[in-house]
Amino acid sequence: MKILLVEDNLEISEVMTVYCGLKKDIDCKVVNSGQEGLERIRNENFDLILLDLAMPEFSGKDVIQSFTRDQLVQKNVVIFTASSDPGVLERMKNTGVKEIFKKPFSLEQLTELIEKYRPRQ
C-alpha cells in the first residue's frame, strides 16, 4: 500500500514515519508542505492521501482546489484537521474528499483508517 502524508506538524510526521516503518507492506511518503504534496499527487499514484487542512503558505484547501471533484474522488484523499468549524468541515466534504479525520487521533484510529482504504486483492 502506498500512502502520502502531507503534514507540516513534525510530531505527526514522525509518528507516521515510525508507524509505517513497522508495517512492511506500507510505503509511506511524508512531505511537509502543500506545494510539495501537490507535486507528488500530480506525479505519483497513491492508495491513500492524508492531507493536513491547515498549513502555512499553501494549505490543504489550496491542494484540494487544484483538482476537480472527480479527480479527488479517485485519489482517496482524507483530510487531517484539528478544526471543529462545522462550515469548513461541510465545505470539505463537498469537494470529493473521502472523509475528515480529526486530530488528535490514536494509533488504533490511524490503523482503522489505513485498513479502510487498503486496496483489495
Question: What is the meaning of each model-derived region?
Answer:
Residues 56, 70:
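The feature encodes the CheY-like receiver
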